[in-house]
Amino acid sequence: MSSTLSVAKAASTPVKQITSAVGPVKESPGNWKHPRLAEITRRQSRNIFGEKNVRQIVYNVAAIVLLEIFRVFASPSIPSQLILPSLRPYSLWIHAVFLVIPLTNIVIALLPLFRPVDDLSDIPLTPAQRKLLGLPPSSKPATPNSVYSTPPRYSRTPSLAGSPASIKSYTSSTLPTASSPTPGAAGIGAGSPAAPIYLSPSKFTTSTSSQQFSPSPSGASPLLHRAISNTSTASGVSPYGSPNSPSKFGASTNSTLAASTISTSTFSVSTTSSIAHVLNNSRLRESVIEGVPATPTPVGKGASVKANSKWLYQRGRRTSSNNWVY
């Protein structure tokens, strides 16, 4: 029999022990309350005449009215056989007891209007606590053995939120400067015309001056190659000068015959370089106005432009006359 009971106990479902997950509440300035706050609230509510008191008075007055209606209209119609003969002499006393109960409740509900105000002088409260509770300052001096209950105090660490150092560091870390590039200026293209442009004068100088015309064997026109080759064959001078002393146009400046022969081709070269220079400057100006980075086109790859300007023609003649001086 005992073995059967032990097997039944082992087969029974174990009961899960429910442990309280809420630990003891530590006192802190955020959740602290006065240890005698419940007593203070109860004693203060005794002097408050509110909605609860009014409701209590109304209900008890209604009960008195119903008792009087029952006594006047219902008691004569009750047969005397239903009332015990021993209770007939006490019928008036029974009616009076039923009337005393609602009258007592009405008097209790009216007591806050006549009860003196409790100043809670027997409870040790600081002046700040009395002010928060709406109590007048205590007229009695504090007893030597009174212990005031106050919230725990913690040392406050100074905040650097409004200090000049924090404002300075925030300004230096967030505001962009003129030297630091902005995200909008990192990649400027045709798809973003409203992006700001950061260009220095040195970039303009480099882009315009680096595209000077230099008649090299790969970039010059075939007519220039032919003119230089014929001149060098007739004078016996290398068409592009010696490696140690290269000249501007590829011919030696000491040879008068080479200079006179090249003067014919110089006009076309100078005219082409002037046109390319004017085109580069106009494209650079348009690119700065439109917000697109300048991409000057080299002379050898530029579009062919008909030079019909009188100014370009006169400039070419002056260049050719200067070459004849040498």
Curated annotation (Swiss-Prot):
- Protein role: Functions as a component of the nuclear pore complex (NPC). NPC components, collectively referred to as nucleoporins (NUPs), can play the role of both NPC structural components and of docking or interaction partners for transiently associated nuclear transport factors.
Membrane topology recorded in Swiss-Prot or TrEMBL: Multi-pass membrane protein
UniProt-annotated stretches for the region Disordered? 134-187, 232-253
Query: Which superkingdom?
Result: Eukaryota
A Pfam family that the UniProt record links to this protein? NPCC
Name the keywords, alphabetized. Answer: Membrane, mRNA transport, Nuclear pore complex, Nucleus, Protein transport, Translocation, Transmembrane, Transmembrane helix, Transport
Example GO biological process: protein import into nucleus
Which protein, by its recorded name, is this?
A: Nucleoporin POM34
Instruction: List compositional bias (Low complexity) regions by residue number.
Output: 171-187
**Annotated Polar residues bias:** 140-149, 156-170, 232-247
Identify one Gene Ontology CC term for this UniProt entry. nuclear outer membrane
Q: What is its main location?
A: nucleus
